[in-house]
Amino acid sequence: MAIILGADAHGNELKEVLKGFLQQEGFDVTDVTDIDKDFIDNTLAVAQAVNDKDTNLGIMVDAYGAGPFMVATKLKGMIAAEVSDERSAYMTRGHNNARMMTMGAEIVGQELAKNIAKGFVTGHYDGGRHQIRVDMLNKMA
């Protein structure tokens, strides 16, 4: 499993914090950020790298998280969540099988962002009754 990271200029500093933290936690991290591009291009780069392998997960950081969320959810096979708390990060993996999350650097601080990222990457899909919802989401895009 690789954790694919991306950011625009507004999220790059927090993305660097997350990269160091996740590497320290022992995760394989790939940074696809092109700082000269906006959130749309960087979100697409993260989502495409996540979709390259079923076990990959993605985290995209910009100022508020909303823009990258909208971009990611337009892509076939991508279930993404905009997250600003630890519990939602963990639960979106467990119940929604989200493979990508977005967050805003102007919304969350560094310590909260680390906890959110850890909750997301350590969460596991529960399957079972949640699969109906995941199937419905996958039919939509």
From Swiss-Prot:
GO biological process: D-allose catabolic process; galactose catabolic process; lactose catabolic process via tagatose-6-phosphate; pentose-phosphate shunt, non-oxidative branch
Enzyme Commission number(s) from the entry: 5.3.1.26
Pfam family, one: LacAB_rpiB
The entry's keywords: Isomerase, Lactose metabolism
Recorded metabolic or biological pathway in which this protein acts: Carbohydrate metabolism; D-galactose 6-phosphate degradation; D-tagatose 6-phosphate from D-galactose 6-phosphate: step 1/1
InterPro entries per record: LacA (IPR004783), RpiB_LacA_LacB (IPR003500), RpiB_LacA_LacB_sf (IPR036569)
Lineage: superkingdom: Bacteria
Isomerase recorded as keyword: yes
Catalytic activity: aldehydo-D-galactose 6-phosphate = keto-D-tagatose 6-phosphate
Similarity section: Belongs to the LacAB/RpiB family.
Assembly and oligomerization: Heteromultimeric protein consisting of LacA and LacB.
Protein name: Galactose-6-phosphate isomerase subunit LacA
Organism expressing this protein natively: Streptococcus equi subsp. zooepidemicus (strain H70)
Lineage of origin: Bacteria, Bacillati, Bacillota, Bacilli, Lactobacillales
Encoding gene, per UniProt annotation: lacA
